Amino acid sequence: MADKIMAVTGHRPEKVGGYSDEASKRLTTFAEEMLKFYKPEAVITGMALGWDQAVAQACINLKIPFLAYCPCKEQDRKWFPESREMYRYLIPFAKEVFYAVPGTYPGAWCMQVRNEMMVDDSDYLAALYDGSPGGTANCVAYAQQMGKEIKQLWDPWQWFLANRC
């Protein structure tokens, strides 16, 4: 099952196991399995904490090109030092880096601009989404509005946690 360009959206660490190294490794392992199953030619990630960065790391591990669609420059400016370090490690591996808006963080709306760019430039969306409101929900809603196929990963993630960890 090979599809072309996959965009990803998903929750921050608080909803997918936390900030520990162990939680990050679990999420990255799940991302690797998801990528092996769907076999995208390339992946678009928004580079947010949690799922987005786990997918970027999985792409590096599997040698799948990824495009970093960042909401703005200095997206990481309010993050913990360890999170900034990871972001700055991942970015140079991106095939290309795009910024949704010029300049530094102008407000949360730039994340939705980024989400729309990701959906518009992809063939389908893979969403690690539990149904709660927020940025992931907004991205999924936009993909639905645009008629994009959405691969919902929350149930497979729950199965993975129960059976593989």
Where are these regions (language model features)?
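Acidic/glycine-enriched connector segments
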Residues: M1-C165
